[in-house]
């Protein structure tokens, strides 16, 4: 199981889309879609949108391998990922640094890819989204850490430059994981 984490604006979705395009048609890799209590037209990643009530029902029914709450939303990784892992596939999921303890409990073999970018790059990308002023963004970035806390197998990828540069590193991690994956 590979979980992709990093701050807003680091380019997690862009890099996951890049890797999915590079691996299109190749067996052994599964990019899972998160279930989120956010509208599909809210922008951002391609996800399965559900209401809070629906999410709670799914969670109570054991439909998630991992679930967590952040920023007023609930997120879930479908339990169907276990079938892919049992088949020997490399499963790639968009996660959260705050949810890594849950991922660690749910998956015995876990690789974390921490996507980071320079603060000025994060600020520019976040500013382009138009949700916060540049000053608010810079203050928030000064207070935040890009590090992953905990005892995890982490590869940090700097996505401050060209997507192809960070994409090459992501592809190496995925290829190495495929080589060591066991059914």
UniProtKB/Swiss-Prot annotation:
Positions that bind ATP: 6-13
Matches recorded under SUPFAM superfamilies: P-loop containing nucleoside triphosphate hydrolases
GO terms of biological process kind: 5-phosphoribose 1-diphosphate biosynthetic process; organic phosphonate metabolic process
Alphabetical list of InterPro entries matching this protein: GK/Ca_channel_bsu (IPR008145), Guanylate_kin-like_dom (IPR008144), P-loop_NTPase (IPR027417), PhnN (IPR012699)
SMART domains linked: GuKc (SM00072)
Entry's Gene Ontology molecular function annotations: ATP binding; ribose 1,5-bisphosphate phosphokinase activity
Pathway: Metabolic intermediate biosynthesis; 5-phospho-alpha-D-ribose 1-diphosphate biosynthesis; 5-phospho-alpha-D-ribose 1-diphosphate from D-ribose 5-phosphate (route II): step 3/3
Protein name: Ribose 1,5-bisphosphate phosphokinase PhnN
UniProt organism field: Agrobacterium fabrum (strain C58 / ATCC 33970) (Agrobacterium tumefaciens (strain C58))
């Amino acid at each position: 199981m590979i979980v992709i984490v990093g701050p807003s604006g680091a380019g997690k979705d862009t890099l996951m889309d890049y890797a999915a395009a590079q691996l299109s048609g190749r067996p052994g890799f599964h990019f899972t879609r998160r279930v989120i209590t956010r509208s599909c037209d809210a922008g951002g990643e391609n996800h399965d949108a559900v209401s809070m009530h629906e999410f709670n029902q799914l969670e109570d029914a054991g439909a998630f391998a991992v679930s967590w709450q952040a920023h007023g939303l609930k997120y879930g990784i479908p339990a169907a990922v276990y079938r892919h892992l049992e088949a020997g596939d490399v499963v790639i999921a968009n996660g959260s640094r705050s949810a890594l303890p849950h991922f660690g409990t749910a998956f015995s073999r876990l690789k974390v890819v921490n996507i980071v970018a320079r603060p000025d790059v994060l600020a520019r990308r976040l500013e382009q989204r138009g949700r916060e002023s540049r000053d608010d963004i810079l203050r928030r970035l000064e207070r935040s850490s890009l590090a992953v806390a905990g005892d995890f197998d982490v590869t940090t990828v700097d996505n401050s430059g060209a997507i192809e540069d960070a994409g090459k590193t992501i592809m190496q991690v995925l290829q190495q994981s495929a080589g060591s994956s066991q059914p």
